[in-house]
From Swiss-Prot:
This is Energy-coupling factor transporter ATP-binding protein EcfA1. One of its GO terms (cellular component) is ATP-binding cassette (ABC) transporter complex. The gene is ecfA1. The lineage of its organism: Bacteria, Bacillati, Bacillota, Clostridia, Eubacteriales. It comes from Symbiobacterium thermophilum (strain DSM 24528 / JCM 14929 / IAM 14863 / T). It is a peripheral membrane protein. Its main location: membrane. ATP-binding (A) component of a common energy-coupling factor (ECF) ABC-transporter complex. Unlike classic ABC transporters this ECF transporter provides the energy necessary to transport a number of different substrates. Belongs to the ABC transporter superfamily. Energy-coupling factor EcfA family.
Amino acid sequence: MTNPYIVAEGVSYAYGREEADGAAPVRLALDGVDLDVRRGEFLAILGMNGSGKSTLARHLNALLLPRAGRVLVDGLDTREEANLWSIRDRVGMVFQNPDNQIVAAVVEEDVAFGPENQGLPSAEIRARVAEALEAVGMSEHRERSPHLLSGGQKQRVAIAGALAMRPACLVLDEPTAMLDPSGRAEVLAVVRRLNRELGMTVVWITHFMDEAVVADRVVVMAEGRVQMVGTPREVFAQADRIRALRLDLPPAVQAAERLRAQGVPLPRTILTLDELVEALCQLYSRP
């Protein structure tokens, strides 16, 4: 997975505008961001509120355009107006609140909204809707009202709506922030399967450290800049730096740290609860 699908080069973005007298009531949200999203990978982007991660997400399918630098999606420059529809066909977006993306009174009609606006034939639309609902495990709910679904189910409908557009890449901006733990697990499992089984490129924006553990790579942002990039194991092994960026460590990493502080000789490479349990079992099953 070394072939970049999306490339950000020196991307800067500010909210607001400069005043005529030279005063600049602007907030720099991105400051010279360089990033590549590799074809077929699951990339997690972490950061505190205000770190720039959501602003960056909106640059990946040209919802926002850089004030400086450029973003290339499958070789297409997002600054070129002629490329916008092609880019948005390639990169689907899912946002934090699924209610803001639901536009129809019936699940299958909501999923069909995008393909209908592409002017596709009815048979093609039906096939895409069926395929997308099957992919997120929502086929049996196709005739229900979205507003009667749980939060996790609504988010799966929003993901199906994006999938019906047949994107090569899915960008999800804190898709589990408004969900309970079971809803979070449900949505993450669906997206992991899309990545692993269908090869879909995934960019997952989150502030939940345990979600980032399943990614191929992790990007940590602060103050509009990329601060760290690496595998989850590489990034979370740098506990002091993570804390300096005012982020938490994954639960298993925290637990292993506390046990080591009590004298339990655990390896520093532990990342998941399963790994922690296995290490403890090996340690205490020795004769």
